[in-house]
Design a protein with these regions (language model features):
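Class I S-adenosyl-L-methionine
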Residues: 1-109, 114
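A generic local structural motif
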Residues: 13-18, 37-38, 62-63, 120-121, ...
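Short secondary-structure boundary/capping segments
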Residues: 20, 42, 67, 124-125, ...
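Class I SAM-dependent methyltransferase SAM-binding "motif I" and its flanking Rossmann-like core
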Residues: 84-155, 199-202
Length: 253
């Protein structure tokens, strides 16, 4: 059996209870060593086989899974954040499906949630944004033409940009090209979300690249942009005294 487990954004205590329990009983852990906090490996049994997938190819990862399955062992494939976002798990699951190897998925806390917590921010504010766009800048891995950053930026929604801090100058240019954001639109960067060395940088879209370079941030950071970081919004209807819900009669009745 293979268990795909989300490790969370960094802090070891942000892994789910289910994920921690699976690590404790695993016979083999294959972890994304470039981003997963190695402190989580302290949950492993003394005789657990541990592999760092940052040093492996997909074929090598799958070979380990096959060997463990043939021996009747439990494998945990430990991915950073939540594996459903930029986790490269589909290509693993398709092979497991084809070979009849059972597996399941345990979600984790994504770094974009951790970034909001670090900023004490809410991505969806009434009259500001009810949409969150999660994307990345095109680099060595291309993006579909219709998903170019400038096209997505045209919506003016809350933007969360993964895997792009090394291209921050191009990110800033694309955000402004979209037309909905101005140089004064609030933005922020969160480095190593929830790790001890976490750092937040607040800026605007117009000063994004300059601020990132000044902070010396070159990797392992999220970029967020949008009016949700500003001061203006309307209170929610849900807790408005005049608003009737299934559980409470409002003054509008």
């Amino acid at each position: 059996m293979v268990h795909f487990v989300g490790a969370g954004p960094g802090a070891p205590d942000l892994i789910t209870r289910r994920g921690a329990a699976l690590l404790q009983k695993a016979d083999c852990i294959i972890y994304a060593g470039s981003l997963v906090n190695p402190a989580l490996l302290g949950l492993a049994k003394a005789d657990c086989a541990i592999y760092n997938s940052a040093e492996m190819t997909l074929e090598q990862v799958l070979d380990v899974m096959r060997q463990m399955e043939a021996a009747g062992k439990i494998t945990v494939r430990l991915h950073t954040g939540d594996p459903c976002l930029y986790g490269a798990i589909r290509e693993q699951m398709d092979v497991l499906d084809a070979e009849g190897i059972p597996y399941d998925d345990t979600p984790g806390v994504s770094s974009f949630c951790g970034a909001a917590a670090a900023l004490n921010a809410e991505y969806t504010l009434p009259t500001v944004s009810q949409t969150v766009i999660i994307t990345r800048m095109e680099g060595r891995t291309p993006v579909p033409e219709k998903e170019k950053l400038a096209s997505l930026a045209a919506h003016g929604a809350t933007m969360v940009i993964f895997l792009s801090i090394g291209l921050v100058d191009k990110v800033q240019q694309a955000l402004l090209e979209g037309g909905a954001y101005t140089p004064d639109t609030p933005a922020a960067v969160v480095y190593k979300v929830t790790w001890p060395e976490e750092k937040t940088v607040r800026c605007t879209v117009g000063t994004l690249a300059e601020s990132v370079h000044a902070a010396g941030i070159t990797k392992t950071a999220l970029i967020v942009a949008g009016g949700f970081l500003g001061r203006n919004y309307e209170r929610s209807k849900l807790y408005d005294p005049a608003f009737t819900t299934e559980f409470r009669k409002g003054t509008d009745q």
